Swiss-Prot record:
<protein>
    <recommendedName>
        <fullName>Protein Wnt-5a</fullName>
    </recommendedName>
</protein>
<keyword id="KW-1015">Disulfide bond</keyword>
<dbReference type="GO" id="GO:0005109">
    <property type="term" value="F:frizzled binding"/>
</dbReference>
<feature type="disulfide bond">
    <location>
        <begin position="82"/>
        <end position="97"/>
    </location>
</feature>
<comment type="similarity">
    <text>Belongs to the Wnt family.</text>
</comment>
<dbReference type="GO" id="GO:0045165">
    <property type="term" value="P:cell fate commitment"/>
</dbReference>
<dbReference type="GO" id="GO:0005125">
    <property type="term" value="F:cytokine activity"/>
</dbReference>
<keyword id="KW-0325">Glycoprotein</keyword>
<feature type="glycosylation site" description="N-linked (GlcNAc...) asparagine">
    <location>
        <position position="69"/>
    </location>
</feature>
<dbReference type="InterPro" id="IPR005817">
    <property type="entry name" value="Wnt"/>
</dbReference>
<keyword id="KW-0879">Wnt signaling pathway</keyword>
<keyword id="KW-0272">Extracellular matrix</keyword>
<dbReference type="Pfam" id="PF00110">
    <property type="entry name" value="wnt"/>
</dbReference>
<keyword id="KW-0217">Developmental protein</keyword>
<keyword id="KW-0449">Lipoprotein</keyword>
<keyword id="KW-0964">Secreted</keyword>
<dbReference type="GO" id="GO:0005615">
    <property type="term" value="C:extracellular space"/>
</dbReference>
């Protein structure tokens, strides 16, 4: 009589935040490329290391997400609320694209529906 061992492997996606952070990091460090006269992709700036198979590359630059662009569907960032103390994507420094921002305070009164 023989015994049979069973091995099950599970593939699971990483945490959504980790995947997003990794993609953003690759996007931020993507290499600008152009086609040479022979139709081969070459780096725009040869001072940087050549991209590997794990790096992102691009030919056309990303649109300016700070300004409204109807052809790309970007609404821009003008008029959006930002968080003055945040260093993240919702922070005023990043979201306002260096244009400055207006500050205001609001007082909001809410009924708490407390029971004693």
């Amino acid at each position: 009589s023989g015994s049979c061992s069973l091995k099950t492997c599970w593939l699971q996606l990483a945490d959504f935040r980790k995947v997003g952070d990794a993609l953003k990091e690759k996007y931020d460090s993507a290499a600008a490329m152009k086609l040479n006269p022979r139709g081969k992709l070459v780096q725009v700036n040869s001072r940087f290391n050549a991209p590997t198979i794990h790096d992102l590359v691009y030919i056309d630059p990303s649109p300016d997400y700070c300004v409204r662009n109807e052809s790309t569907g970007s609404l821009g960032t003008q008029g959006r609320l930002c968080n003055k103390t945040s260093e993240g994507m919702d922070g005023c420094e990043l979201m306002c694209c260096g244009r400055g921002y207006d500050q205001f305070k609001t007082v909001q009164t809410e009924r708490c529906h407390c029971k004693f």
